[in-house]
Amino acid sequence: MVTKVLNWINYRLPIVNTFERHLSKHPVPKKVNFWYLFGALASIVLILQIVTGIWLMMPYSNTEEGAFASIEYIMRDVDYGWIIRYMHTTGASMFFAIVYLHMFRGLLYGSYKKPKELVWIFGATIYLVMMAEGFLGYVLPYGQMSYWGAQVIISLFGAIPYIGESLEVWVRGDYYISGITISRFFALHVVALPLILIALVCLHLVALHEVGAGNPKGVDIEEFVDEDGVPLDSVPFFPYKVLSAMPAIGVFGLVFCIIMFFFPEGGGYFLELANFEEANPLVTPEHIAPVWYYAPYYTMLRAVPDPFGGLIVMAAAVAIIFIVPWLDRSNVASIRYKGILSKIAIVMFVVSFITLGYLGTVTVTETGKIMSIICTVMYFAFFLLMPIYTSIEKTYEVPKRL
């Protein structure tokens, strides 16, 4: 009877076929390293953020008078409210950390090379939506840093010639950060952007499963198949890769819980101390700094004296990620088989990005200004010079099999 019901459903809604195509019979490379775990971890944290976000949304008040008070109510009076909030705030930082590592893996092993261009573009779009989602959520507690951080970021729209002032008011919905701003940011944060994010993640996975997952060697496993057309150097995603990822997921869960229970503020990087004070439009904090995952772009913004020029540089720093598939002219995908120029370039890129991140969290000094300019140039040089150094360098022969 159960079998008949399942067959009836599957005939009309191909659940079994979908499960087999994307999980139980989906071939993935049999040899990968720990860099390939971050995609699965990102999916887990995304689910965690959605679930905790729903619970936080229930007692939250999206008004100017009630926003900060409702956060305090959640922390003090709602049963387990404090752990749900810390789970959400810790999850936000962990989500960005995982996605940064996931993107770095893509740069290391050429996860953007033909035919994976759409996989990369969907991933870059996910990152862009995450940045918007994180900013909107950052404003909702209506603490001191939320208020003034939003004021700084939204005021950037005012630097756009001709339409800037009107656009700034339109984004805020008022002439200052008010209840109207909180309400519209709340709607976008809990409804619009999560739906877009989920849709993009689905497209990202479908595109990935269509062209096949990569591997550290950059070998095309589709070249050698058995009589059934299954790649010889592959294993089914489920249960093999799922079970092999379980220890890493357990370690990640342990680290996550340690941070959540013992260091939820993350030394002021996850939750700024100024945000434990209610927003006061009459008192400006001594140092306005973004959350750590926006810090590199904030440093680029500050590196340019002209506000509009800084806005262009900051936007270009994100936009240039989208065209990486067409900048890399190398005939190999993996950094293992690229030349010394690519290896030097990616080391300089990592150093510049981390330095930019640090500079964005500290007060501005003359030395910091010089360093921010140098690191901004290094950041863009990695991308803009990529067509040159990937074309002229000597590469190594890629093995045929894993």
Where in the sequence are the language-model features?
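Membrane-embedded and interfacial regions of multi-pass energy-transducing membrane proteins
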Residues: M1-M94, I98-L402
